[in-house]
Amino acid sequence: MALRFPRFSQGLAQDPTTRRIWFGIATAHDFESHDDITEERLYQNIFASHFGQLAIIFLWTSGNLFHVAWQGNFELWVQDPLHVRPIAHAIWDPHFGQPAVEAFTRGGALGPVNIAYSGVYQWWYTIGLRTNEDLYTGALFLLFLSAISLIAGWLHLQPKWKPSVSWFKNAESRLNHHLSGLFGVSSLAWTGHLVHVAIPASRGEYVRWNNFLDVLPHPQGLGPLFTGQWNLYAQNPDSSSHLFGTAQGAGTAILTLLGGFHPQTQSLWLTDIAHHHLAIAFIFLVAGHMYRTNFGIGHSMKDLLDAHIPPGGRLGRGHEGLYDTINNSLHFQLGLALASLGVITSLVAQHMYSLPAYAFIAQDFTTQAALYTHHQYIAGFIMTGAFAHGAIFFIRDYNPEQNEDNVLARMLEHKEAIISHLSWASLFLGFHTLGLYVHNDVMLAFGTPEKQILIEPIFAQWIQSAHGKTSYGFDVLLSSTSGPAFNAGRSIWLPGWLNAVNENSNSLFLTIGPGDFLVHHAIALGLHTTTLILVKGALDARGSKLMPDKKDFGYSFPCDGPGRGGTCDISAWDAFYLAVFWMLNTIGWVTFYWHWKHITLWQGNVSQFNESSTYLMGWLRDYLWLNSSQLINGYNPFGMNSLSVWAWMFLFGHLVWATGFMFLISWRGYWQELIETLAWAHERTPLANLIRWRDKPVALSIVQARLVGLVHFSVGYIFTYAAFLIASTSGKFG
């Protein structure tokens, strides 16, 4: 009996129903709830699993390099990045007829292939890779790192190599090592790679291990560093006529502050990027020496937090008690990490298109669209996860005595004010934005488009102007041609910035109008409503007026039985579940906005977005319907084309999405009756009844069915939009 799954819970292993399997899977990673778990084993298990995670990441990136080297056209693409379509990998499919073979044979390939929309070609090209051999070398190295990570994970589960709890809770040492080691040293190493390999490659110089020590990255070598003449490293940058990857128009500078974009590649100057990483390295190397460890010097985190007591007394005991609360709660730490990572992932989405770092990626429109959408969706899931673990912290780890009258306790004490203010903001944004959209729709429907309410986003335009955009005529700060900042910017710092801001060929500070104003507020509504649901879930996780003893029921409970009305749907898990729908909704608006604005920008018909985005029918007709036309003709009775796979995925995505509602709308009783009928039929069907099982089939729990429904909804939603996005963009621009 003891060998039955799940091994980590004897109670579940003895469950006579199929609940054993599903609950076993659901709690497999909830180490805290496992039998015989100790705090020490908990930390050690998580630590070891991190190495497994790293191994998977290295294996995955190694696979990307390997397949492109084996089946891609990297060397061909390098010769002409703007016109050769990069190949991700070959397709072998016995279902392909001759028309499909022809449709999918692209990019100079001999047979059917997938085109890469991930940007890896541009990334590898920018960092100095040039041949398939380079890619194979990288793949092998990452495979080696993957194996090392697996060995390290196994090693740290062996008794002699298991770190103690005190090692895991040594916050200062961890901060120092992560700041200096992880960020500082790796940023410095990356600066080194850019200066020694990538920048020479961009100037036609091929640096590898065999000539690494012979090629000086700068004509004067380390001289300027030791003599304090650092400005010499910035002199003679690449000229505006520089052809990337060649010596034509190349300079000798390695660390610059040019600003703006390389005219040919439309990406940031590599010498600016190297300078940026050097600055980051310096800051983090200093930061990683600030906390007190073995030598009795530097800051103590506990002292820092305990000192944060506002003198006016308006925040009670301030940050007292927070050090132990955070340091002893893995859920709190995970919540903070996820919140930070979520914000950074969203910033990556924004900056990858507005300030592209990789050569020629800005001209690969489908890749730009795919990467923006990809990073925004990931950011959404990570951020909702932050609140989920924040709520679990309040249920499992929060100690009221330890946090009496500090900022954490005061958040809980005035949660009604927080939640009601968020609710008011959401209602205000929602009704006003929808009201404006609907008014504009009615005006168009009745043939009086001139009666639309169109609000210019003057504050946002003023901010853009302050940063140097002149087209609005605000004449303020950097857009004021007579101002000292404007004139200094021409020579002293970032001379290319003002040109870049005022050029129409990039995505930096796009011109905005009434359509942008409206969709901005629609997105603000989505963000505030998602936040409202998540914040309410976390702040009410321990209890509410309706259910003061909520924390005793755990993170995810369906209801407290039939005798206590109104306790359904109020667990912290339910808040997370509802928030994910709103998160997906919001990111839908974000990606629709980004994609439509950019399609019109790339096609040169910006007026379509400006005129049609001020009313809902414009979005439905001129964005969704108009851009799905090529997609839904991917295959028809007369034949198929290279969009057919996306057309099929579009259909399949709708199917998966719709399946979600089956789980979300019908509940346990319906499924239990169905299961019992099916089991009855199975037992009476010849041949089928030879197959028997020990577990009595029972329906999923309410919470599990909601999870399954949510997963189908989310996956289907993303599949559908991914197919639409890639097909509509690649169908127009190749």
Swiss-Prot record:
Binding site for chlorophyll a B3: 662, 670
Family: Belongs to the PsaA/PsaB family.
Pfam family for this entry, one: PsaA_PsaB
Native source organism of the sequence: Nicotiana tomentosiformis (Tobacco)
NCBIfam families in alphabetical order: psaB
Residues given in the record as phylloquinone binding sites: 671
Record's function text: PsaA and PsaB bind P700, the primary electron donor of photosystem I (PSI), as well as the electron acceptors A0, A1 and FX. PSI is a plastocyanin-ferredoxin oxidoreductase, converting photonic excitation into a charge separation, which transfers an electron from the donor P700 chlorophyll pair to the spectroscopically characterized acceptors A0, A1, FX, FA and FB in turn. Oxidized P700 is reduced on the lumenal side of the thylakoid membrane by plastocyanin.
Name recorded for this polypeptide: Photosystem I P700 chlorophyll a apoprotein A2
Localisation per UniProt entry: Plastid, Chloroplast thylakoid membrane
Keyword tags: 4Fe-4S, Chlorophyll, Chloroplast, Chromophore, Electron transport, Iron, Iron-sulfur, Magnesium, Membrane, Metal-binding, Oxidoreductase, Photosynthesis, Photosystem I, Plastid, Thylakoid, Transmembrane, Transmembrane helix, Transport
Membrane topology designation: Multi-pass membrane protein
